[in-house]
Curated annotation (Swiss-Prot):
The lineage of its organism: Bacteria, Bacillati, Cyanobacteriota, Cyanophyceae, Oscillatoriophycideae. This is Deoxyribose-phosphate aldolase. GO terms for biological process: 2-deoxyribose 1-phosphate catabolic process; carbohydrate catabolic process; deoxyribonucleotide catabolic process. It comes from the Bacteria. It is found in: Cytoplasm. Catalyzes a reversible aldol reaction between acetaldehyde and D-glyceraldehyde 3-phosphate to generate 2-deoxy-D-ribose 5-phosphate. Keywords: Cytoplasm, Lyase, Schiff base. Belongs to the DeoC/FbaB aldolase family. DeoC type 1 subfamily.
Length: 225
């Protein structure tokens, strides 16, 4: 199908992400305004910005999502749970949680399961497990996905964007593994309309990107050509 197909509402796929350590309150306000204007599902921000983002989006349809254990996933389970619960107390509705990659590679499947399951159960919110697929073999991707789905996540997410980004092949692989049990979030390095459409066609149900406005504008321009 052509990338300009009218059946695709690109904005409804985008988690509008502001995940740079130098982000200011002014930038956060601008991102929240953009998310409301373009009707993005969420604004994704660091935990320290959750409360302000919730205030800025009070009464709006756009939700606030945040990242947990970001970007390395190597904090303790207790710290991750606290970070997640505090974020929910501050109004976050979706949590993008980086899994412990060292545990995965060490074969500590039960510890990994318990960590993710506890966050899912204790917060009661939408949890997206960040697998960091660029750092994993196909066997490790499959194992991580199965553990996280069994633990109760709502999405499998490809990447933090710090160690490589989303690829069409990884999205297809996760879609095949998930068999429709969970959504697939592609994240990292999504800068062009062609990339976004390819990832969606491959099976992505969310896109994590800081370029959401640019992507929607690119699509609009393509329609008008």
């Amino acid at each position: 199908m052509a990338i300009t197909d009218s059946d695709l509402d690109l904005a409804q796929y985008i988690d509008h992400s502001l995940l740079i350590p130098t982000a200011t309150s002014e930038q956060l306000e601008a991102y929240c305004q953009q998310a409301e204007q373009y009707r993005f599902p969420t604004v994704c921000v660091y935990p320290a910005a959750v409360k302000q983002a919730v205030q800025l989006l009070h009464g709006k349809k756009t939700l606030v999502s945040t990242v947990i254990g970001f970007p390395a996933g190597a904090t303790t389970s207790a710290v991750k749970r606290y970070e997640a619960l505090e974020a929910v107390d501050n109004g976050a509705k979706e949590l993008d949680v980086v899994i412990n990659l060292g545990w995965l590679k060490d074969g500590k499947s039960e510890q990994l399961f318990q960590e993710i399951a506890s966050i899912c159960q204790e917060t009661g919110q939408t949890v997206k497990a960040i697998l960091e697929t660029s750092q994993l073999t196909d066997t490790e991707k499959r194992l991580a996905a199965e553990i996280c789905m069994d633990a109760g996540v709502s999405y499998l997410k490809t990447s933090t964007g710090w160690f490589g980004g989303a690829t069409v092949s990884d999205v297809k692989f996760l879609k095949e593994i998930s068999k429709g049990r969970v959504g697939i979030k592609a994240s990292g390095g999504i800068r062009t309309l062609e990339q976004a459409i390819a990832l969606i066609r491959a099976g992505a149900t969310r896109l994590g990107t800081s370029r959401g406005v640019d992507l929607v504008r690119q699509q609009k321009a393509a329609f008008e050509e």
